[in-house]
Regions:
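ATP-dependent carbohydrate kinase catalytic cores
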Residues: 92-121, 206-211, 218
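ATP-binding/phosphotransfer module of carbohydrate and carboxylate kinases, centering on a glycine-rich
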Residues: 1-49, 164-305
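Glycine-rich phosphate-binding loop of actin/hexokinase-like ATP-binding domains
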Residues: 118, 123-176, 260-265, 269, ...
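Short beta-strand scaffold segments in enzyme catalytic cores
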Residues: 6, 14-18, 62, 128-130, ...
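Short, flexible, glycine-rich and Lys/Arg-enriched loop motifs at helix boundaries
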Residues: 68-74, 103-122, 252-278
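Glycine-rich beta-strand-to-loop/alpha-helix junction loops that act as flexible
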Residues: 58-63, 130-133, 238-248
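Short glycine-aspartate micro-motif
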Residues: 4-8, 55-57, 93, 126-130, ...
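Short beta-strand-loop/turn "lid" adjacent to the catalytic site in phosphate-handling enzymes
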Residues: 49-94, 103-110, 252-253
Length: 305
């Protein structure tokens, strides 16, 4: 029986899985830590050898332009037609990673979404955002139309959010993901203390006597709430805002939800406050969002190959 190979290349790992039959689940899910992915063809050869794979859906962290993606955080480029021709796939689809996450919504049960704030749906717009190695985001309109963004590399909000960390010097922090990502947590902690720790270690120190860890995480939480508040109004996300990624799943366990909602509302004027009050905010608790999104995308396009 032929299979589809699903691959997600993020800033740190390559994750993969297979699916076949009615394409309802992921099989043999695994990951490869990446220090360099210049040998991607070799990796792909190993993943398809004697596996009866005839189709590939691959999501990559970077903007898709004319069928190609060049990663923003790595020296790596990929073209879907080149891959299809080289490996003789029946079909090959290349997605931006957040395009893939937008397609993942249909895979979730209600138990897969932890609710920070309930809401009332008033249109078909869903907004996804996730601070990880960088900061990704996408808009889902209805169930099929996903518009990935490069919000993490914009600069308009950075200076305002630096105030949440009591940083006046913006020279080291220019883009939104410089102040709102896992890397940002590490960079800001190091900027404040001179000590380099992983974002995971800093999150684990939250609530301890490490005052700077507490301060940085509090600043991060406020920055996230203020950012999604602006995104909610920018995209009128009447179907909800969904925050994804392992980092936010960890922070969700320790953060003050009521304070987060207070930051989300901010000092918006009445009519805009009323919009925010209707918007649901959820945390995607299901792992492998991109792989699920890749599979859902494939199922939608299986008869179009």
């Amino acid at each position: 029986m032929s299979k589809v190979l699903l691959i997600d290349i993020g800033g740190t790992n390559l994750r993969y899985a297979y699916s076949d039959g009615n394409y309802s689940s992921l099989n043999d899910t695994n990951k490869i830590q990446l220090s360099c992915i210049k040998g991607f063809d070799e990796i792909l050869t190993n993943l398809t050898k004697e596996k009866d794979v005839d189709s590939l859906v691959i999501s990559v962290a970077g903007p898709k332009i004319n069928g190609s993606i060049t990663m923003t955080n790595r020296d790596f480029s990929i073209n879907e037609q080149d891959i299809k021709n080289t490996f003789k796939f029946k079909s090959c689809h290349l997605l931006n990673d957040w395009e893939s996450i937008g397609h993942s919504l249909a895979a979730y049960e209600s138990s897969d979404i932890a609710i920070i704030k309930d809401g009332t749906e008033f249109n078909d717009n869903s907004f996804f955002i996730g601070p990880g190695t960088g900061l990704g985001a996408a808009l889902l309109i209805g169930d099929d139309n996903v518009i990935p963004t490069e919000i993490g590399n914009t600069t308009g909000l950075t200076k305002a959010l630096l105030k949440n960390y009591a940083i006046d010097n913006a020279d080291h922090f220019r883009t939104l993901e410089d102040v709102l990502s896992g890397k940002a947590i590490s960079d800001i902690y190091e900027y404040k203390t001179g000590q380099r720790l992983s974002s995971e270690d800093i999150v684990q120190r939250y609530g301890s006597d490490d005052e700077m860890a507490n301060y940085v995480i509090d600043g991060f939480i406020k920055s996230l709430a203020e950012t999604i508040s602006d995104m909610a109004l920018t995209f009128i996300a009447g179907r909800g805002i969904y925050i994804a990624g392992g980092l936010i799943r960890s922070i969700f366990q320790i953060m003050d939800k009521e304070k987060f909602i207070e930051y989300f509302y901010g000092d918006k004027k009445l009519v805009h406050l009323q919009i925010l009050e209707m918007i649901k905010i959820g945390i995607v608790e299901k792992e492998h969002a991109c792989l699920h999104g890749n599979l859902n995308f494939y199922k939608k396009h299986i008869n179009k190959a």
